[in-house]
């Protein structure tokens, strides 16, 4: 039996802190470093799993080259640093994180409370975490925008949602989640562009979206994560960190696989229903 989400988040936080338990330095610096390692490592893991998933659904090497761009300089971990951390804690934190993503609805803001707790802890309001949009407020803003868009349900073509100061994706995740409630065909219309000046926040936003795409198999039309100053660095000077455009072949094969799965479940239900009727008729 799995633990309640609150306890899983607590266990995840404790596991993250253990990543740098062997490091020297102050408590604050060790925790900040642990969070950075956790986010970058898990983003790398999830991106590898996304590419493997695309291959599973028929994407060729050429299609992957054309549809997936990753700037490794943002997520690479120094080998010297990697050799000095608690690898067991890192692996455990990755396992717990994936379990939390699986347990929550698709495109949930898993990292908000985690980052807020770590960055604001003992900071007396001086940490960057204070600027992350609270999930309740993000959902309210999204709902207000939703009401104003009368043609939302009639959309049949990809459309863009852009956030220039995205943080960990707090404002764009609810939009993706609302479309996901309708169905996979709706998230496949989302062209998300998220930007932040902080490279770690860009990694966090990318991790949140990619992990849901992998774990819940809800593909986006495109995800573009940009690391730049939105006021001074505009195209073509803005820097794309991650660009993922789901290949059409993958979208088609995912639909076929899920349709087949639903058909098999329906057949099993009919079979069980038939057996039940026979037993009842005999009695």
Name every feature range the model reports, one short phrase each.
Residues 91-94, 141-144, 279:
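Generic low-complexity, intrinsically disordered sequence content enriched
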Residues 109-136, 143:
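Class I SAM-dependent transferase core
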Residues 134-235:
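Conserved S-adenosyl-L-methionine
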Residues 202, 208-283:
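S-adenosylmethionine
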Residues 1-119:
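A short N-terminal interaction module
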Residues 22, 56, 67, 112, ...:
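Histidine (H) residue identity feature
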Residues 26-34, 99-106, 126-133, 163, ...:
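Conserved aromatic-histidine-acidic binding/catalytic patches
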